[in-house]
C-alpha cells in the first residue's frame, strides 16, 4: 500500500513512478483510500482541506515514490454562450448556488444536474453533455498549496 502524505513542488525533471487519476470530487478528499487499476491500494493522508489539482505530485511516506495526480475524465455539462456577458451571467447564477464550476473565457463546465441544465438553457446557453476532465475553481479560500 502506498501512503501519500506530502505534496511535492512541481518539477519537470522528477521521475514519477505512478499516475493517480481522480475525479474533481475525489481531488477534494484529503484522507481517502483508493484502489487503482492494477489492484494496488493508495491511501491519501494529507493535511485537512488540501485540494489536489491536475499535475500535482505526491510522495509516498515509505519509499519516496512520486505519484502524479491526473484529472480523471468524468461526466460533465459544458455550457457555451453567444456573448461573454451571457456567460458571465450564467457563472453568477451558478455561483449563487455554490456549484463547483470550471470557468474559462469560452465555456463553463459543471457536474451534471438536470435543474441547472434547464436553468442554463432557459438563459440561452447551449449545453453539451460530455465526459472530460473537470477542474472547477477552488473558490476564494481554496488554494492552500504553492504552484
Swiss-Prot record:
Family statement? Belongs to the UreE family.
Q: Which domain of life is it from?
A: Bacteria
Report which gene this protein is encoded by.
ureE
HAMAP family membership: UreE
Q: Where in the cell is it found?
A: Cytoplasm
Q: Which UniProt keywords apply?
A: Chaperone, Cytoplasm, Nickel, Nickel insertion
Q: What is this protein called?
A: Urease accessory protein UreE
GO molecular function list: nickel cation binding; unfolded protein binding
